[in-house]
Amino acid sequence: MGKNRTIVLGAVLVATLLTGCGGQDAVLEQHAEAEATSSPETTEVPAFHFESGTLELGDFDPQTLGDDLFDPCTEISEEEFAAAGITGVENEPALYRGNAQGCRTDQPEPAVTRTVIGARTTSEDAANAADYEFSFVESSVDGMYTFKNPIANPYMCIAQVDTQRGGLAIGISVSGLKKEKIDPCKVAVSELSNLYRSINNG
């Protein structure tokens, strides 16, 4: 029951962000300024170089994305997942509700549940969603951010990076005695960073 409940909650978390609007524009402006001051000599667009094709990082418009939402369950191979330490990947029907699509995986460790998600949620949606904690993070993946709802579930967090085909995210939920020992946001950031590194350096 715990695992299914977590997965469904993750689907709801991603979907409800699309209607959220709050007041964290300053956070996004600060991030934009930081990007503007980065080296102008860098011309290569950061991307995930999957066997199925290149997934470039960048902004997207969920209203015009249509059917081109990236599906991590079918467009990332079993071998590519395994290289990042992700096994047991299976489609999760609860996530296929139009706003997101994704899959559950084997637990990275006992009491820690992991989902891989393709979402129409943008960084702006996440930053403006009421009751959510949002933060850009330092990572090898340019523009990665985390968000969670401490009211609905303080032990679940999603790390996401926006791409030209929607958000690519990994959600982590912690249960049992590990709730007070593991930071789900740190784990989610590590998992998504590992996927990026393994794909691009493999």
Please provide the spans of the model-predicted regions.
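N-terminal secretory signal peptides that target proteins for export/translocation
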Residues: M1-K3
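Short, intrinsically disordered, charge-biased short linear motifs at domain edges
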Residues: R5-G10, E56-D61, I86-P93, I170-S173
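Bacterial lipoprotein signal-peptidase II cleavage site
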Residues: R5-V8, L17-V45
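Sequence contexts marking disulfide-bonded cysteines in secreted/extracellular proteins
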Residues: G22, P72-T74, G102-R104, M156-I158, ...
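N-terminal low-complexity, Pro/Thr/Ser-rich intrinsically disordered segments
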Residues: E33-L69
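Negatively charged, low-complexity tracts enriched in Asp/Glu with abundant Ser/Thr
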Residues: L69-T74, E138
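Short, solvent-exposed recognition patches
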Residues: E79, A83-D142
